[in-house]
């Protein structure tokens, strides 16, 4: 039997890690030889989740072609967000809830993408369709992913399907959603001990009309906890622009209590962000009122503006 590795995107978040583990558990129950791995360090929110449910973190890998010939992707599809040697392996399956971009294969594959708030919402359907029982632990992980990606159902990406899935998973995991959810989000929003690199850890790269754009996001309970370190943050953003040849680096600092954000933009195309949101950046900073979702309120808007 051919072994498969399953993983989410670089700079993994809670959905990426929990989806990889959950997908692996589903496939193992069906007799597959599969292992969940990760492409980066855990953030503090995900570390809290794994500790809470007493789950070992997936193994960290830099490359995959040296181990396997087949992989499955969760929570992403875009090539630049995936493992560096993705072109050297065969992608046999994708389960995702993002746009499809910069992705093609030479062979047919299982591809499932749905416009929901979280990958594990789709995975719960797959467990049920295949009549595989969701364990208490895996239910806790899947619930945590939904809470994370939907900001406890406050994000505009959240659908009724996500809410229904969360209720079902909470019953299996024996977790009270609101109290656990706030505890989990606050664990991720504590930036007091984070390095500057860790503040920018949740970053994704996109190709927008032949422009290289990186968008990082962090959730906080007070944006000033990050803005007080703006000089250090901007220095690292600038270095990333040089190292990666980026046209734009946008850092979205989201207050999970007010559901507003502040943006820091650096690069040759910052005017695109100003046009997209009708704001003016002063010392690289501007308010982004009501913006909480990179997937729904940042990526598509910037993509459309770059295309003008």
From Swiss-Prot:
Positions contributing to Mn(2+) 2 binding: 15, 75, 97, 149
Keywords: Cytoplasm, Hydrolase, Manganese, Metal-binding
EC number(s) given by UniProt: 3.6.1.1
Cellular localization per UniProt: Cytoplasm
GO molecular function, one term: inorganic diphosphate phosphatase activity
Cofactor(s) listed in the protein's UniProt record: Mn(2+)
Binding-site positions, Mn(2+) 1: 9, 13, 75
GO CC annotation: cytoplasm
A Pfam family per the record: DHH
Protein name: Probable manganese-dependent inorganic pyrophosphatase
